[in-house]
Structure formats: structure tokens, C-alpha cells
From Swiss-Prot:
GO terms of molecular function: nickel cation binding; zinc ion binding
Function: Involved in the maturation of [NiFe] hydrogenases. Required for nickel insertion into the metal center of the hydrogenase.
GO biological process: protein maturation; protein modification process
InterPro entries given in the database record: Hydgase_Ni_incorp_HypA/HybF_CS, HypA/HybF
Residues that, per the record, bind Ni(2+): H2
Family, similarity comment: Belongs to the HypA/HybF family.
Name of this protein: Hydrogenase maturation factor HypA
Superkingdom classification of source: Bacteria
Coiled-coil ranges per UniProt: none
Amino acid sequence: MHEMSLMESVIEIVCETARQNGATRVKSVRLDVGVLSHVNPDALIFCYEAVRHGTVADSATLEINRIAGEGWCLDCGKTVALEERFGACPDCGRHRVQMTAGDELKIRDMEVI
């Protein structure tokens, strides 16, 4: 389960950022997780519950925003929705689509006090 190491890194970044900004507690964390990122949101939530204890994020809520897959078709020049990595362009059917969204995992923001 790679979600555990991902969430350990998220908590480490959140706690370090809180410390650098003089915060004593983190109230909430919002993540952007792409639907094509191969990251399971339910597993992230489970891991979050396990790794936040004993940190400044101990009582922080977690919100996960799912980011849709999107790409730029190099053949027809359109921005298109992607349902899978390396999928075909839904307009022209060709596979020369450069992914532009949907594979990210990032901390969108956090609320501290």
C-alpha cells in the first residue's frame, strides 16, 4: 500500500509548514488527487487516521478533491477528457494525447491556528 508512505510525506510537509509559520495546530488539510494517479482515496483516508496522531495535525480534518483526467490531443488540437492513462482522444480516436490533469497528488491548502 503506497498510500501509507504518501500520507506520511503529506503529514511531514503539513507539520513542517505549520511549524515554519508559527502555528500550534492544524485544523484542516485539503488534497487534490487525480483520478488517474493510481492513488486510492479511501486508503489515503485510512492512512491519514493512522499517521496524524501525535502531531500538530492530530485533530485536523482531511478533504480530498478528485481531479478529472484531461489531456491535449496533438492530432486534433483539442483539450479532451481522459478516462484512462494513455487513452485515445474521444474526438479523433488517436492515441497522441498528452495528459494535462488527473495524475496529480498535491496539498491544495491547510488551515492552521
